[in-house]
């Protein structure tokens, strides 16, 4: 998930010697620039917001952080929004994220985009409520791609039992996370696809899948895939204690790679959905194009994504231990993700993804190809 671009030292730039040998692409890709005013292309949107409490940021959605060449990775977009929120809150009384609830509304494209951050005021003396929206201008139209609403706190001042509003209540393990009924407000455009899947999956009632355990980190030199180690009972040993080079109950992990970016709060949204990226949808306009062949039988575009931060991510954290539980409910897949540190000693966050499940092969077969659509109205069959 991390590209480490070597910076050339053979340059006429006098500042080149101060540049580190490795540049972390995640930090570059999630960088936001604060604007003095709303961009002209979003004037119609800016007129509906309070100028005194709204701040605008400019950013670039990079193609390297896409599930497909033109579909941004949902976890990356979530981290982009959190980057703007952290930038906005860094000098405020409450600098740490506590709860974030994302709604994925429209599929955006690589290119320039803008984020509006609006302070909703202090709901109490313990936390601040804040909202952000990710926009993109396309063909003189304004697209609202992702919106997020959440609360920020000062985790260093939290002592004893929390009085903040909790999404799940006190949770110390994945089994304690409830499975609520999905309540998504926005659906993909193809109603036929939705109806077909609802008819099929409603008959299954509720199906709970087994737990899945992963150890994940930023890959030292690959921007496209996370480096992960699957949980294995064969490598578990009750007698062997955890150490800097061994995670109890897992394979031996190279924990001390100097080239792997350390994990922080900004990267949690991306790690929370690495196994099911929001916007994971490789259906394109031309199903016969060689790059449009589906990579899996089913696609799971995420509609809602909620994160509750349980604690600050410890300094120098390289690996995270993630537990996944999936539940099929009425045409949706509810994914609960419990995230702890590499040794499982400290819980970091709980994530929940509400995703739509549909058969990609069926969907592709109902979409006309670009060439055949001119000759015949019949659907293309793969």
Swiss-Prot record:
Which superkingdom heads the taxonomic lineage of this protein's source? Eukaryota
Induction, as annotated: Expression is strongly induced under conditions of nitrogen starvation. Expression is positively regulated by the cluster-specific transcription factor rua1 that recognizes and binds to the specific 5'-T/G-G/T-C-G-C-A-T-A/T-C/T-C/T-G/A-3' upstream activating sequence found in all promoters of the UA biosynthesis genes.
> What InterPro entries does this protein map onto?
Acyl-CoA_hotdog, HotDog_dom_sf, Sec_Metab_Biosynth-Assoc, TesB_ACOT8-like_N
Bias (Polar residues) ranges: 1-20
- For region Disordered, the annotated ranges are 1-22
Role summary: Part of the gene cluster that mediates the biosynthesis of the glycolipid biosurfactant ustilagic acid (UA). UA is a secreted cellobiose glycolipid that is toxic for many microorganisms and confers biocontrol activity to U.maydis. UA consists of 15,16-dihydroxypalmitic or 2,15,16-trihydroxypalmitic acid, which is O-glycosidically linked to cellobiose at its terminal hydroxyl group. In addition, the cellobiose moiety is acetylated and acylated with a short-chain hydroxy fatty acid.
Q: What is this protein called?
A: Ustilagic acid biosynthesis cluster protein orf2
Q: Which organism is it from?
A: Mycosarcoma maydis
